[in-house]
Structure formats: structure tokens, C-alpha cells
Curated annotation (Swiss-Prot):
TPR repeats lie at residues 282-316, 374-407. The modification Phosphoserine is found at residue 108. Keywords: ANK repeat, Cytoplasm, Mitochondrion, Phosphoprotein, Repeat, TPR repeat, Ubl conjugation pathway. It comes from Bos taurus (Bovine). Component of a CRL2 E3 ubiquitin-protein ligase complex, also named ECS (Elongin BC-CUL2/5-SOCS-box protein) complex, composed of CUL2, Elongin BC (ELOB and ELOC), RBX1 and substrate-specific adapter FEM1A. Interacts with PTGER4. Interacts with NFKB1; the interaction is direct. This is Protein fem-1 homolog A. PANTHER family: ANKYRIN REPEAT CONTAINING, ANKYRIN REPEAT DOMAIN-CONTAINING PROTEIN 16. GO terms for molecular function: EP4 subtype prostaglandin E2 receptor binding; ubiquitin-like ligase-substrate adaptor activity. One of its GO terms (biological process) is protein ubiquitination. Phosphorylated; highly phosphorylated in myoblasts and myotubes. Phosphorylation at Ser-108 promotes PGE2-EP4-mediated inhibition of inflammation. Dephosphorylated by protein phosphatase 2A (PP2A). It is found in: Mitochondrion; Cytoplasm. One of its GO terms (cellular component) is Cul2-RING ubiquitin ligase complex.
Length: 653
């Protein structure tokens, strides 16, 4: 163990005497080095503050000159928080004595992490009321500094259910109607977490019932998350804009005027909504029933809520009609929503139809752009797959994928997850078919080809974005999944017309000239073993000669270069794949092309393996190649003296 790590570990474990022994007598430069960041990104002061070692903290600051503002990486609840100052770590862990000490020594009370989280927000997150009181009351911590998502201290207190912290923040003038980047308010956070008492507290402070960026009211948010207590409370008949406090609820009086009912919403305007209208109550109960079906798996509970919704629809002789769908959906087995009490009661004998009703209701109320809509369609498909009904699963997943591609941004994590699920499912079904023969589940060319086309479309959409996605891990993963789908497609028999369609689709992909990590083309990725790892379950195995041949047949450039000037031949050599190397060479790959380190592919082959003996480089090296390498090796000037095509040829070597 080196000295730097020993200092860090001593600070982490609170071993002051050992720390003093390690650091005493050191020069200022040595102390600065030893109290700086370790390999994991943390510092001794940061880790000591995180674990509440007051004596170590004060020693490092007072005697060793450690900076109270230096940020670093620290672990909390299984996550790595980057750029966290020591005060943030102490506040998050609830170490009030360390918080006091750091502030006395000049720490900034509003210093943020990389995600713009303040020490106050950290204390609010885990419910450290005394730390919150000290930061706000003694050091005037800013209540309104939001994190990168626009989420404030009041919002996180409400979401985590810390009632006394929420009450204190409101007393100090926290803005009760502040909006996050996605338009949600503290009321939404209460509804999503089921904190009825805090929700009542917010309403007592004139919190407004408004829609977020997805069009969700707090009432609908409670329905989606299945918090019946919130739904029941909000659908009670209470006049909109009622200024009277709720029975038994002490109204909090904010010290400032920022949460007054006249406070205008900041930024984008959102529609205010009345939570107690008949239509809102009906939709909330219907959506709550859908949540009972898919999330709580309680069909009888769902029927109870749907009955109440149906009664409200017919209340007073004025029927509230449901909008007619433009067309019935194959994925939903052409189901349509029930409209009468008799149709509703008949559902009790048909659980599968109840599950389709839940999907229909969710899509109608939340709309196709809400993440829950496609999520539960995929969830229902997965349940069918688990029971062996792969055909029904594929239909639902295709419908969800279309919904995601039409409504979400390119390379959305949800869309990527759908593509990966398809690849894993197709791999499983093909293996099942291989093992069971005709008894296995059949999977057709159309199923695989349809998803491959959608995958190529996703890459095309991503490349149309203003920002270049080439360095994005998500983009690399999308390319890898497409290659896995192509790998699986090679295992399915197809007609000449289908083969032509497959080649057209691959040509579309190559025409986009997509680049993954390190500038890898699809051909580079097809010869790289790392492409195998795309998810939890195995799909295809790479390097893959079959995929390489398809890519080459469709026009992939065998001499394309990555950021290190490696050709696919170099990557194939690093993976010791002589069969693939021969295929690349036959397609015109230059055997003696060098990379940025002046290595040819042949030189990268492992000497210990037979691969090197199966490749004969001199069979593919021309006199022109040798002359080009001689020019480069001897640094003979050639630019401007020979044709441009020859200059490019020499640079290849």
C-alpha cells in the first residue's frame, strides 16, 4: 500500500494518531500531495467528513492545510456522488458537529456537487432536520438552489416523506409552487410518494394543483403510483380555490411572501387544474384501477375502482362519454374499452381482457409520450413471454417500440432497452427452436427484419441531431444491438427477395457512416469481442464471420480507420481471428496498413497462437506497398512531388 492510500484509509477509519504519524514533519508540498485526491476520486478530508470523524477533519484543515472546498467523489446509498465538497458529505450523513466545524473554517454553505446539489439538499434528502435548521437558521443557506433537474430542497423533502423538514422549509419561505425542469411541483412529489400529511401541509400553504410537462396532475400522479389515500383525499368535493384550511390542519405561515396565492408561475406556463371535477375524478379512478391491475396485481381491487368511475360517469343522468379510439389495435387483441356497467361486470370472468383494459385506459389518459404507457405494454408482453406466448409478446413489444420512436428523443434509454429486450427474446426463441426442433416456437424473418429496420431508423434519427452522438455510450450500444440482430437474422432462412431486403437495410446503416466508441465503424465492431457484451443475457457471439461477410457484401470499407488509425484488420488481429482476417483481405483490406503506433495487423497477432502461422503477409504485399513503407521509414519528403492518390496510399502505410 502506498503512502497516499494509507493516509486516505486512516482518515476514513478515523485513526487520528496514525494519520499524525504519517503526516507529521512533511513539507507543505508533500502535505498538499498526500491530502489530495486518491485514485477513486476522493480526498482524506472528504471521506473523514462523510464518516463524521471531527478530530480528523479539524487536523487535516488546521494542521495540514486541506482545502474545505475541494470536491471529490464519495459513495452514498450505492451511488457515487461526484464533485462533492466535504460540507455536502457531512450534511448528507447528518454529522452536525462536522458541519459546524467546516462552516467555522470557511466552507461555503451553498457549494454544490457536479449535479448542482447543495449541502442543504443533501440534508433534506436523508431527513437530517437539525442539520437543515443549522444550515438555514445560522448560515442562511439558499432554499431555492435546485439540482440539475430543477428539483428543490422542498421537493425532495416531500418526496422522501420528511414532514418536519418540509414544514420548516415552508416556514422559512420556500416557494411552494416552484417547478422542476419537467414541470412537476412539490405536490407531485407528495402524490408520488404517498405523503398525505405533507400534501395537506402544502395545500394549507396555497399550493396549486397544476399539470407537469407530461400533462400529469398530482391526482393522476397518485393514481399512477397507486397511492389510494392521496386519490381518495383529492377527489373529495372541495371547491376549487378554497381559502379555508382543511379540518384539523394547522396552516403554516411562511416568513416570506414568495408562496402567496398571487405568485406567478416561473418559466413555461402550465395549465392549472381542478382536482375535484367529475371528469378528473373519473380519470383518476380509472387510472388507479389500471395501476391495481399491472403494478399491484389486484384485479378485484381494480374492479372496485372501475365501478366507482363508471358510477361517476353516469352520475346525475349526464353521461361522460369516453373518446372513441381512431382504430382498434392488434397488439391489444382488438379490445375496446368497456362503456356500461354490464360490460364492466363481465370482465371478472376474463382476466386477460381486464389486463387489456388497463393498457387501453393508461394510453388514453396518459398518452403515448408518457413513459409509463410504453413501460406497462412491455411489462405485459414480458409476462406473456414468460408463459410461452411469444407471438403475443412480440406484438405488444412492437407496438411499444413504435410508440417510443414516435414520441421519445432518439437513443432514449427506454427505446434502447426495448431493442435489447427484442434481441434477447429472439436469441432465446432461436435457441429454443434449435433444441426442440419443430416443437420449438417458430420465429419468422419478418419479426427479426422489422426490428432491425427500426434499429437502423433509430441510428438515422440520432445522426440527424445537432450534437454528434459518436462518443455516446448509448449510441455505441445501439450499434452493437443492431449487429446482434443481424447476427440472429443470419440464422433464419430467407428467400432471395428477403435477402435483398436485408442487404438494403444494412446498406442504409452503412450509408449513415455511424461511428461508435473510439471511432469504430460497424465493421470494426463486428470483429471486436467486446461487442458480445450488450446486456445481462447472451445474444450473439463476436467476432462474427457471418456478420462481417454481410457488412462487406453491402459495401463496408475494409480499410476504414478508427481514432487510433486501426483498420478492422487490426482489430481482428487483436482478437486473433485469422478466418475473419482472410475474409477482410479477400475483400481488399490492406495487409500492411499501419495504425497510429506504426503496427501492421500481422504484428498484432499473438505469437503463441496458431493464428500467426495461418496468415502469410507476403502473399498480399506488393512492391508498391514496400516502396511506400520505405518512404515513410526513411522520412523521404514526397508531398507535392507525387499525385494526391499516391500520397493517400503512402499515408496508409
Amino acid at each position: 500500500m502506498d503512502l497516499h492510500t494509507a493516509v486516505y484509509n486512516a482518515a476514513r477509519d478515523g485513526k487520528l494518531q496514525l494519520l499524525q504519524k504519517l503526516l507529521s514533519g512533511r513539507s507543505r508540498e508533500e502535505l498538499e500531495e498526500l491530502t489530495g485526491e486518491v485514485a477513486s476520486g476522493g480526498t482524506p478530508l472528504l471521506i473523514a467528513a462523510r464518516y463524521g470523524h471531527l478530530d480528523v477533519v479539524e487536523y487535516l484543515v488546521d494542521r495540514c492545510g486541506a482545502s474545505v472546498e475541494a470536491g471529490g467523489s464519495v459513495h452514498f446509498d450505492g451511488e457515487i456522488i461526484e464533485g462533492a465538497p466535504p460540507l455536502w458529505a457531512a450534511s448528507a450523513a447528518g454529522h452536525l458537529d462536522v458541519v459546524r466545524s467546516l462552516l467555522r473554517r470557511g466552507a461555503s454553505v451553498n457549494r454544490t456537487t457536479r449535479t448542482n446539489s447543495t449541502p442543504l439538499r443533501a440534508a433534506c434528502f436523508d431527513g437530517h432536520l437539525e442539520v437543515v435548521r443549522y444550515l438555514v437558521g445560522e448560515h442562511q443557506a439558499d432554499l431555492e438552489v435546485a439540482n440539475r433537474h430543477g428539483h428543490t430542497c422542498l421537493m425532495i423533502s416531500c418526496y422522501k416523506g420528511h414532514r418536519e423538514i418540509a414544514r420548516y422549509l415552508l416556514e422559512q419561505g420556500a416557494q411552494v409552487n416552484r417547478r422542476s425542469a419537467k414541470g412537476n411541483t412539490a405536490l407531485h412529489d407528495c402524490a408520488e410518494s404517498g405523503s398525505l400529511e405533507i400534501l395537506q401541509l402544502l395545500l394549507g400553504c396555497n399550493a396549486r394543483m397544476e399539470r407537469d410537462g407530461y400533462g400529469m396532475t398530482p391526482l393522476l400522479a397518485a393514481s399512477v403510483t397507486g397511492h389510494t389515500n392521496i386519490v381518495e383525499y383529492l377527489i373529495q368535493e372541495q371547491p376549487a380555490g378554497d381559502e379555508q384550511a382543511q379540518p384539523g390542519l394547522a396552516r403554516v405561515q411562511p416568513q416570506g411572501a414568495r408562496s402567496s396565492p398571487e405568485e406567478p408561475p416561473s418559466g413555461e406556463s402550465y395549465e392549472s387544474c381542478c382536482p375535484t371535477s367529475r371528469e378528473a375524478a373519473v380519470e383518476a379512478l380509472e387510472l388507479l384501477g389500471a395501476t391495481y391491475v399491472d403494478k399491484k396485481r389486484d384485479l378485484l381491487g381494480a374492479l372496485k375502482h372501475w365501478r366507482r368511475a363508471m358510477e361517476l360517469r353516469h352520475q346525475g343522468g349526464e353521461y361522460l362519454p369516453k373518446p372513441e379510439p381512431p382504430q382498434l389495435v392488434l397488439a391489444y387483441d382488438y379490445s375496446r374499452e368497456v362503456n356500461t356497467t354490464e360490460e364492466l361486470e363481465a370482465l371478472i370472468t376474463d382476466p386477460d381482457e381486464m389486463r387489456m383494459q388497463a393498457l387501453l385506459i393508461r394510453e388514453r389518459i396518459l398518452g403515448p409520450s408518457h413513459p409509463d404507457t410504453s413501460y406497462y405494454i412491455r411489462y405485459r408482453g414480458a409476462v406473456y413471454a414468460d408463459s410461452g406466448n411469444f407471438e403475443r409478446c412480440i406484438r405488444l413489444w412492437k407496438y411499444a417500440l413504435d410508440m417510443q420512436q414516435n414520441n421519445l428523443e432518439p437513443l432514449s434509454p427506454m427505446t434502447a432497452s426495448s431493442f435489447l429486450s427484442f434481441a434477447e427474446l429472439f436469441s432465446y426463441v432461436l435457441q429454443d427452436r434449435s433444441a426442440k426442433g419443430s416443437l420449438g416456437t417458430p420465429i419468422g424473418f419478418a419479426d427479426l427484419m422489422g426490428v432491425l429496420c427500426k434499429g437502423v431508423r433509430e441510428v438515422e434519427r440520432a445522426l440527424q441531431l445537432p450534437k454528434e452522438p459518436g462518443d455516446s455510450a448509448q449510441f455505441t450500444k445501439a450499434l452493437a444491438i443492431i449487429l446482434h440482430l443481424l447476427y440472429l437474422l443470419e440464422k433464419v432462412e430467407c428467400t432471395p427477395d428477403q435477402e435483398h431486403l436485408k442487404h438494403q437495410t444494412v446498406y442504409r446503416l452503412l450509408k449513415c457512416a455511424p461511428r461508435g466508441k473510439n471511432g469504430f465503424t460497424p465493421l470494426h465492431m463486428a470483429v471486436d469481442a467486446e461487442t458480445t457484451n450488450v446486456g445481462r443475457y447472451p445474444v450473439g457471439r463476436f467476432p462474427s464471420l457471418q456478420v462481417v461477410k454481410v457488412l462487406l457484401d453491402c459495401g463496408a470499407d475494409p480499410d476504414s480507420r478508427d481514432f487510433d488509425n486501426n483498420t478492422p484488420l487490426h482489430i481482428a488481429a487483436q482478437n486473433n481471428c485469422p478466418g475473419i482476417m482472410n475474409a477482410l483481405i479477400e475483400a481488399g483490406a490492406h495487409m500492411d496498413a499501419t495504425n497510429a503506433f506504426k503496427k501492421t495487423a500481422y504484428e498484432l497477432l499473438d505469437e503463441k497462437l496458431l493464428a500467426k502461422s495461418t496468415i502469410q503477409p507476403f502473399n498480399y504485399v506488393t512492391l508498391q506497398c514496400l516502396a511506400a513503407r520505405a518512404l515513410d521509414k526513411n522520412k523521404i519528403p514526397y508531398k507535392g512531388f507525387i499525385p494526391e492518390e499516391l500520397e493517400a496510399f503512402i499515408e496508409l502505410h
